[in-house]
């Protein structure tokens, strides 16, 4: 299948909400080992986000039911739920491993612009973070370490190549701060990172470009919402 056909089919699959097929089409595009256009990059991101998002939502629901049944002492149900949760976890792991391989083999080595380097390293951080959400023991530690490393690599490039108001730089700060809060259990670090990103963007609001105004201000609002939430639950830490 040619590059253009794969992109067209990915768009078609998106319209049809057939995200697994959208992923397969975008993997064809990614394997060409050339820098993707902004549109192609976004298609790839949307495809994986939908495929992983549905399962992350399922995992949260099932985990919550498991905890309720456990507290009631319903052992036979807990056994069934546990097996079902593990089935979802193996699907999550497969998707994460899949995109992480695509990133390491094709997308990161082919990235030329600072913007795409930040985008892909951030994505790498995100999918290792998703693994860390459900992994335990050494696997959790490995995923958390890899996530931290990827977010740090993305931040390094973002600080030199992207304006503080750039939506990709802001999105990175948002996700990196969530990683500190949820995975590393470091609310002080999470608040510091989110506040710094928000304040830096506010200070340079005049650099906000017309086309990214909506995206940037939305992410700034999300950073602010998280800060409000974290400050109310951890007043002494934030």
Curated annotation (Swiss-Prot):
Pfam families: 14-3-3. PROSITE patterns: 1433_1, 1433_2. Disulfide bonds: none annotated. Disruption phenotype: Diminishes colony growth and affects conidiation. Decrease in the expression of transcription factors brlA and wetA, components of the central regulatory pathway essential for conidiophore formation. Increases the expression of nsdC, encoding a transcription factor necessary for normal sclerotial production, ans subsequent production of sclerotia. Also increases the production of aflatoxinvia the induction of aflatoxin cluster regulatory genes aflR, aflJ and ver1. InterPro entries: 14-3-3, 14-3-3_CS, 14-3-3_dom_sf, 14-3-3_domain. CDD domains: 14-3-3_fungi. It comes from the Eukaryota. Gene3D superfamilies: 14-3-3 domain. 14-3-3 family protein that plays a role in the morphological differentiation and secondary metabolism biosynthesis. Required for normal fungal morphogenesis in an environment-dependent manner, affecting the balance between production of conidiophores and the formation of sclerotia, resistant structures that are necessary for the dissemination and survival. Acts as a positive regulator of conidiation and a negative regulator of sclerotial production. Belongs to the 14-3-3 family. This is 14-3-3 family protein artA. It comes from Aspergillus flavus (strain ATCC 200026 / FGSC A1120 / IAM 13836 / NRRL 3357 / JCM 12722 / SRRC 167). The lineage of its organism: Eukaryota, Fungi, Dikarya, Ascomycota, Pezizomycotina.
């Amino acid at each position: 299948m040619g590059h253009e056909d794969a992109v067209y089919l990915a768009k078609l699959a998106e319209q049809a909400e057939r995200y697994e097929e959208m992923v397969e089409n975008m993997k064809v595009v990614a394997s060409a080992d050339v820098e993707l256009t902004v549109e192609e990059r976004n298609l790839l991101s949307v495809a994986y986000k939908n495929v992983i998002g549905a399962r992350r939502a399922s995992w949260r629901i099932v985990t919550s039911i498991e905890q309720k049944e456990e507290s009631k002492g319903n052992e036979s149900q807990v056994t069934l739920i546990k097996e079902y949760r593990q089935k979802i976890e193996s699907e999550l792991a497969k998707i994460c491993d899949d995109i992480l391989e695509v990133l390491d083999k094709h997308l990161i080595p082919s990235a030329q612009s600072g913007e795409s380097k930040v985008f892909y390293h951030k994505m790498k951080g995100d999918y290792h973070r998703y693994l860390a959400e459900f992994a335990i023991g050494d696997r959790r530690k490995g995923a958390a370490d890899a996530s931290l490393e990827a977010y740090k690599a993305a931040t390094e490039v973002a600080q030199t190549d992207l304006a503080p108001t750039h939506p990709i730089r802001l999105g990175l700060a948002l996700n990196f701060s969530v990683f500190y809060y949820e995975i590393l259990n470091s609310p002080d670090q999470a608040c510091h990172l989110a506040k710094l990103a928000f304040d830096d963007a506010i200070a340079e609001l005049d650099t906000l470009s017309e086309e990214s105004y909506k995206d940037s201000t939305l992410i700034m609002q999300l950073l602010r919402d998280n800060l409000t939430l974290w400050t109310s639950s951890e007043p002494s830490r934030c």
